[in-house]
């Protein structure tokens, strides 16, 4: 127990120590100030902007910014789709893996351009090295950079006033990749290689075991993909077992680096925001609320797994319980990680839009599985994905400002800018579109017989598997309850739709809100005298409960039919 507490404290301290320097660095990068990586990144940026021409030089309005973002994503989608369909005839395919079917290729392409990395295929048998490196790994970089661009555009809109532009998407995209994601990923990949993660393009090895049987040992460019998988909060594993596989996550050190990587940029953006708007206290308040939500989620999930079998009344289990005095749920977990390393990793990955796992979520107790769902359903605002976590949290922040101001009889304003009805429309659109998508698609899937045939469990747990799939897809997480066999035409297409709606529906609302905020006048005197204090402890509590009430209660009826009912069923075994 003491070692678990030390690990947790070390993790939190590491994230806190990273936040300010990395946040300041991100601020300098996007504010066109000198950085210590200019010598490395500028040559790449010059070539990139030279190819783009004039489109990368002019500042863009919100509509133009969104149009550029969607145009880029469409091109990326077509690029990935074609490679996946044709991978059987492309080079670097020593295992002679065939091209995907169209529904599966469509699902996978959508998954990677939306930073979801939902996988209805097994990585070691479904994708060639060429497709892994040129299609999927590239999207791990640029899809994360797209989310970062949206967050930066939103931050600019708060900091600027009485103007019409929020930056240039193409310029921001290059900065996100060349100054931030690529350099850090190179360092992480080198560390992974030294820790034993393979990085090659060899054919799979066929070895004879001591038992006289043949075993196939997969190979591949794993370290490079694993680095950006976590840093870019992508989560798509090179192997079907994801970070439970010893080639993806061989040591406690790689496990720790992956967890820190997932939260690093998301945490840093809170300081970037505070520094950019001239109020670092505001940034630290956001960090604090995120941290409290994370701790609560981790505690509930860990206790559920450490004591997940204590309530079972089976005689056989009671006999074991009587012998050991305590029975934790180790099903689906790596013995080298144990319960706490597993719950910590999976709380991190479901709080962010990462989706990587080092244990099987479908084997978790219903209450622990519910916490994973809730982390995603509230919009993954507990630090969250690269960029996506910040702009998702900002929507709740705006709602809390609006509610709090009206409660005390003041005109809603945030950092000197009036919050008007149109702003709240975009805010609520961003907050509700993913949840509506989840409820509609889950309801449809629950009454379709062909979907029932893909389940390995029935009843409440079977419903939980369906619900988890659409929560994960719509919130661009990508993790799954493994009991759902997702490679069917219906699930491939509907989960792809949920990923598209959850990604670009929210981004559209966020950018439109940014376009509204950037045009407003900014009066700091008005903010100080007649508005809600948005850096106070009381406001932090208001934001906390706004997230729980709006995000949590909306999905609560569905959770009641799934994991809550599943937990109650277990209690009466």
Curated annotation (Swiss-Prot):
Question: One short Pfam family name for this protein?
Answer: KdpA
Residue ranges annotated as transmembrane are 6-26, 66-86, 135-155, 177-197, 257-277, 283-303, 382-402, 428-448, 493-513, 537-557
- Keyword Cell inner membrane attributed: yes
Keywords associated with the record: Cell inner membrane, Cell membrane, Ion transport, Membrane, Potassium, Potassium transport, Transmembrane, Transmembrane helix, Transport
UniProt xrefs under PANTHER family:
POTASSIUM-TRANSPORTING ATPASE A CHAIN, POTASSIUM-TRANSPORTING ATPASE POTASSIUM-BINDING SUBUNIT
Q: Which family does it belong to?
A: Belongs to the KdpA family.
Quaternary structure annotation from Swiss-Prot or TrEMBL: The system is composed of three essential subunits: KdpA, KdpB and KdpC.
Q: What is the stated purpose of this protein?
A: Part of the high-affinity ATP-driven potassium transport (or Kdp) system, which catalyzes the hydrolysis of ATP coupled with the electrogenic transport of potassium into the cytoplasm. This subunit binds the periplasmic potassium ions and delivers the ions to the membrane domain of KdpB through an intramembrane tunnel.
- Protein name (record): Potassium-transporting ATPase potassium-binding subunit
According to its UniProt entry, this protein's organism is Francisella tularensis subsp. tularensis (strain WY96-3418)
Q: Which gene encodes it?
A: kdpA
């Amino acid at each position: 127990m003491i070692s678990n507490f030390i690990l947790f404290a070390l993790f939190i301290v590491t994230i806190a120590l990273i936040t300010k320097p990395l946040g300041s660095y991100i601020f300098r990068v996007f504010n066109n100030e000198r950085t210590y990586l200019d010598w490395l990144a500028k040559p790449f940026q010059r070539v990139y902007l030279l190819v783009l021409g004039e489109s990368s030089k002019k500042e863009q309005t919100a509509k133009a910014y969104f149009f550029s973002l969607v145009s880029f994503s469409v091109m990326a989608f077509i690029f990935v789709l074609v490679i996946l369909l044709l991978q059987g005839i492309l080079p670097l395919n020593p295992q002679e893996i065939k091209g995907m079917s169209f529904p599966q290729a469509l699902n996978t392409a959508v998954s990677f351009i939306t930073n979801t990395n939902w996988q209805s295929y097994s990585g070691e048998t479904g994708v060639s090295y060429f497709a892994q490196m040129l299609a999927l790994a590239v999207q791990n970089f640029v899809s994360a950079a797209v989310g970062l661009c949206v967050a930066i555009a939103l931050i600019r809109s708060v900091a600027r006033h009485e103007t019409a532009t929020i930056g240039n998407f193409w310029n921001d995209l290059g900065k996100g990749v060349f100054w931030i994601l690529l350099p850090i990923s190179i360092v992480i990949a080198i560390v992974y290689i030294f820790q034993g993660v393979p990085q090659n393009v060899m054919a799979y090895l066929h070895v004879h075991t001591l038992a006289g049987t043949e075993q196939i040992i997969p190979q591949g460019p794993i370290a490079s993909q694993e680095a950006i998988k976590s840093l870019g909060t992508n989560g798509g594993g090179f192997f079907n077992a994801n970070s439970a596989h010893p080639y993806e996550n061989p040591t406690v050190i790689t496990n720790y680096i992956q967890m820190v990587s997932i939260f690093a940029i998301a945490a840093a953006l809170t300081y970037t925001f505070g520094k950019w708007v001239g109020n670092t206290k505001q940034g630290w308040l956001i960090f604090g609320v995120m941290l409290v939500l994370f701790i609560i989620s981790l505690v509930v999930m860990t206790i559920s797994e450490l004591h997940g079998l204590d309530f079972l009344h089976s005689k056989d289990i009671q006999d074991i319980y009587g012998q050991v005095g305590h029975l934790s749920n180790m099903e689906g977990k790596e013995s080298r990680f144990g319960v706490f390393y597993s719950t910590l990793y999976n709380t991190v990955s479901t709080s962010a839009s990462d989706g990587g796992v080092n244990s099987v979520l479908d084997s978790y107790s219903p209450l622990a599985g519910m916490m994973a769902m809730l982390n995603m359903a509230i919009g993954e605002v507990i630090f969250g994905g690269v960029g996506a976590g910040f702009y998702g949290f900002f929507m709740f922040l705006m709602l809390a400002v609006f509610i709090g101001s009206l409660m005390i009889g003041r005109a809603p304003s945030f950092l000197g800018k009036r919050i008007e009805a149109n702003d709240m429309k975009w805010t609520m659109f961003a907050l509700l579109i993913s949840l509506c998508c989840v409820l509609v698609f889950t309801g449809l899937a629950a009454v379709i017989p062909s979907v029932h045939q893909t389940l390995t469990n029935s009843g409440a747990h079977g419903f939980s598997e369906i619900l988890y799939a659409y929560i994960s897809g719509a919130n661009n997480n990508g993790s799954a309850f493994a009991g759902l066999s997702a490679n069917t035409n219906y699930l491939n297409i509907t989960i792809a739709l949920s990923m598209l709606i959850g990604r670009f529906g929210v981004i559209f609302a966020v950018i439109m809100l940014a376009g509204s905020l950037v045009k407003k006048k900014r009066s700091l005197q008005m903010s100080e005298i007649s508005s809600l204090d948005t850096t106070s402890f009381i406001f932090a509590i208001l934001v906390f409960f706004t997230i729980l009430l709006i995000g949590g209660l909306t999905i609560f009826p569905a959770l009641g039919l799934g994991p809550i009912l599943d937990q109650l069923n277990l209690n009466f075994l």
